[in-house]
Every structure is written in C-alpha cells, then in structure tokens.
Amino acid sequence: MSFRSAEGVSIMQALAMTVAEIPVFLYSTFGQSIFSQLKLSPSLKKVLFATALGSVALALTAHQLKRRGRKRKQTLGKEAQKPVGIPEQLLRSSRPASLKRGPVPARQMMSPSTRSNDTLSGVSSIAQSKHSSSSHSIASMRVPSSPNQSVNAGAAWEAEPVAEEPAVGEDANAENLYLMGMELFEEALRKWELALNIRHRSHSRASASNSQGSELVERHSPEVRNHQFAERLETLLHRAYHLQEDFGSTIPPDSLLADLESEGTLILPTLGSSHPIQDDDATTVTSDDSFFSAAELFETFSLEDSFHLLKPAALYEEALSLVKDGDVACRSLRTELLECYSDQDFLAKLHCVRQAFQVLLLDETHRMFFMETGKQMISGLLVKANKSPKAFLESYEDMLQYTQREETWPVSKMELEGRGVVCMNFFDIVLDFILMDAFEDLESPPSSVVAVLRNRWLSDSFKETALATACWSVLKAKRRLLMVPDGFIAHFYVISEHVSPVLAFGFLGPHQHLSEVCTIFKQQIVQYLKDMFDHDKVRFTSVPSLAEDILRLSHRRADILMGYLGIENLPETNGALPKSPCQAESGNLDASGQQD
C-alpha cells in the first residue's frame, strides 16, 4: 500500500517538474534566439519571456471562457423560447386563468384588435392593470424568459388539470369567437359614428362659409357628394343598430359571454352628444355604470345631427320644428312599437297623422267606412270564436249614437283627459287608447289567470268560463267607480264585456286555431300602424296626400282581415250569426234538398 502511494507521489512530482521545465525549454529553444538581439542580463530576459508567455496564456484562457459563456446563453435562450405545455382543453375554451381558478374582479379581457394604434379603446379594465399590445387570447400567451419558470412550468400546468369535456370546450371556443366578432362589430360602429361626426362638422363649416357668399358654385358638386355619402352612412348605421339589437343576446346565460359580462369586461367608454369621440390613447372608463347598449348610444345623437330625410317632406319638417319647440304631446310613446327613428321622429309623425285623420273624418263616407270596418272586424272575430255578436252589435250601436251627439263631447273629453288622452283624435282614442292598450294588457296578464289557464286538470270550457267571469267582474268593478256612469268610458266598458273575454281566451287560451286568429288580427293592426308611420309607405309632404295614403292603407288592411275572417256581409242589429262561406254553401244545399 505504501509502495503504491509512493509511486503515485513520484508520478505527480515528475509531472510537476515536467510542467515547470516547459517555460525553461521554450526559453532555451526560442527565447534565446529572440532576446539575443537585446542587450539585457540573462535573468531579465527570463522574466520578460515568462511575462509574455503568461499574457498569451491568459488571453487564450479568457477567449475560451467567453466562447463557453456565449454557448450557454444560446442554450438558455432556446429553452426559454419554447412555449409551455398548455392543455388542449384549455386552449379550446380560451378562457382567462381567473375564470378557472376563482373570481378575480380585476382581471380583464381586451379586444383582439388592440394591437393596432388606430383602434378605439372599447374595453377597459376595472382595476389598475397592465395593458399589453398583443392579443389577450389564451392561445397566444407565452411564459417570460426565466430559467426557473421554464423548468417548472410544465409541472405547474400538469398539477392543475382542467376538468372540461371536449364538446363543452368547442362550444366555449365558438362563443368566444362570437364575442370577439361582436367586439369588432362595436368597434366598426364607433368608426362609422366618428366618420359621420366628422362629416357633419365639415358640412356645417362648409355651409357657414357658403352663407357668406364665397365660392358657392365651386362647392356645389362636392357638397352633393358629401350629402349622399352621409345619407348612405346613416342608413348603414341604422341597419347596424337593428342588427346588433337582434343578435346581441343570442349567447346562452351559462356560457362564456355570461361569465365575462358578470365580471364587467364588456365596458364601453362614455360618449356624449356634445363632445367629440375620444382618441385611441384616451383614458378608458373604469365604472360599471358606463355600460350601455348600442340603442342607447344611438339615442345620444340629436335628431338634427344624425337624421336627414331621403325625400322631401314639408309636412314632416314643419311638425318636427313643433316637436323641437315642445308643442307636440302624447299619451304614451310608441317609438319602438312603430319602429320610429327616435321619440322626436315619433312625435313629428304623430302630429302629421292627427292632421290627416281630422281631414279624413270630415267626410261622411270615410266616417261610415271606419265605423263599419270596426264593427265587421270585431263581429268576425266573435264568429271565429263561436260567439254570437248580437250583444256586441247592440252595444256598438249605442256607443256610436252616444258619440254622435255633440252635447256629450265635453264630458267625453273630460273623461278621456283623465285617462291621459291629450288629443281628441281618432288615432289617440281608438287606435292608441283602445286597441294598443288592450294588446299591452294581454301581453302581461295576472298570474292568477295564467295559473288557471295552465292547469291541465281543468277542462277548456271551465277555463273559458273562469276567464270570462274574471273579466266581467273587473269591468263591473271599474264601472262602479266611474264619475260619469253613462259616459264614454261606461259605453266602452259595455263593449269590452263582450270582446275582452274572447280576446283574452284567444291570446292566452289553449285553442290553437283561435290563438292564430287573434294573433293575425293583432299583427295586421300593428302593421297598419307601422305603415302609417313609415316614410316609404305614406307621403309626409302635405295633409291631403298623407290622408289619401292612410285611407288607402286602411282599405288594404280591412280587405285582408275581412278576407281572412271569411265574412263579406254582416247583419246590422238582428243578432243572427254571420255565415262563413262554408256555412252559406251548406245552407244552400239544405234549401235545395227541401225544395226537392
């Protein structure tokens, strides 16, 4: 053992001596010839040679260490650029991590188009958070270039598996794409609104300059093109708002969209009609109260700034000026029901329609047409429900006789004004107060009535009797509270006692055929009113032209309803059931059989 250790020591000594003799060997071989020309002492020559040799060795060592460090950095960079292994199901769902691990209100999702500086900041954060310039989709996320994170990232993802079915992931992915598309659509709306606002500002400046009498002829052609462009842009915006209202709520409430909305991620910046649209780098809104729909955003623009008629309408323009002055009132706004552009648009058209009906009803022929049409429609509806129209016809005649007496008009006006009717006009009394209110009441029936009609253990006849009894009791109770026991409202309640149970059972009852009849009746009435408020269906140029168009629409809708109800001639007051074409044909066959 000692021999082996001694042998090892001798080998190490020999190697050390060999290494130590290398500089001496190099000096004796090369150093003497190099330093022979220098007049120095031998010891100084050895020192200079050792210094030069050490410097060369040190430089070679530093170069080698530098190359090794560069290779190590390249290796670490390649490892850091590799994406972390994200589960496939999480990629499909594309949900932020905050939605998976727990509710974090400060987490936000931005629009995928925020990578461009030209986009508006449509989505903002609730709390202070860092906004990235890239898309915030979970599929494009990368882990920072840290060695520690790159080593343990895969284990972290594997430690938190996502329990989600593949089909659910695909649905969530589709819903996320829908959400991104809606965000882009809202951004397009903002751009169009900005373009329209700029166009109106330029148009106002151009008109101001033209009013001073400078360059009127030269500006005429560009102004016409600008006006046409603004009209097309307004039409596009109007259709886009309707499209967003129709398809803005098609995602189920338990989906990704509902989750995002619950965290307040769809927040739009506030916008006022008197302030210009903010730039892209403007401060975003951080309040949940700033969320509003496209319809509300559309209403913030004034009518004079965003709506121009495509065809001349002097009567409408005059009515619109009265509306702006606050001289036109109504009982209830029907803007959405009649598909008007805004409340001002509805009021202006309402004022025109009132004037047209005043002109129409000056003619005795037109008055008789409207009276007979109403009687025939309600009688035909009762016949479709297998009810006798005798009592209704008698009450209807009493009502007409009461309204034709001029001494009753002040009392009727007082009663109707107490119900909110602001104008004694055919539209306000018959179409709005009677028909539209009846349709609205049938859309929200009492819960007790709905419970009876949905009870499967009750027969249809019992349901119809119970509903009729409820209507009669309510109407009789209202009649006892009237200030004028034999006035206009009292006569109206008498008619309602015969018509309301049939309409209620038709709209709410189990009979499909009667429900279809009542639904078509309502659709025709509502469409008749919509056509009356449509610039494409009637002319708002003058009162006679509008009255002529309304009369034409009235005849057309009356023909449609009479043809659908299958009744041509109705009895006046004899109470006999009107015969449908089938019943008339069978009656003729019976008569011919008796003659034979």
UniProtKB/Swiss-Prot annotation:
Predominant localisation class: mitochondrion
Membrane-spanning segments: 11-31, 40-60
Presence of keyword rRNA-binding: no
Tell me if Hydrolase is a UniProt keyword of this record: no
Keywords for the protein's UniProt record, in alphabetical order:
Membrane, Mitochondrion, Mitochondrion outer membrane, Transmembrane, Transmembrane helix
Pfam families with a match to the protein in the record: Miga
Please name the GO terms of the biological process aspect recorded for this protein, alphabetically. Answer: mitochondrial fusion
What domain of life does the UniProt record list for this protein's source?
Eukaryota
> What's a single GO CC term here?
mitochondrial outer membrane
Q: How does it sit in the membrane?
A: Multi-pass membrane protein
Stretches the record annotates as Disordered: 67-158, 576-596
Gene Ontology terms, MF aspect: protein heterodimerization activity; protein homodimerization activity
Q: Where is the composition biased (Polar residues)?
A: 110-123, 143-152, 583-596
Q: Where is the composition biased (Low complexity)?
A: 124-140
**Where does the record say this protein resides?**
Mitochondrion outer membrane
Q: How does it assemble?
A: Homodimer and heterodimer; forms heterodimers with miga1.
So what does this one do?
Answer: Regulator of mitochondrial fusion: acts by forming homo- and heterodimers at the mitochondrial outer membrane and facilitating the formation of pld6/MitoPLD dimers. May act by regulating phospholipid metabolism via pld6/MitoPLD.
Q: Which family does it belong to?
A: Belongs to the mitoguardin family.
- In Swiss-Prot or TrEMBL terms, this protein is called Mitoguardin 2
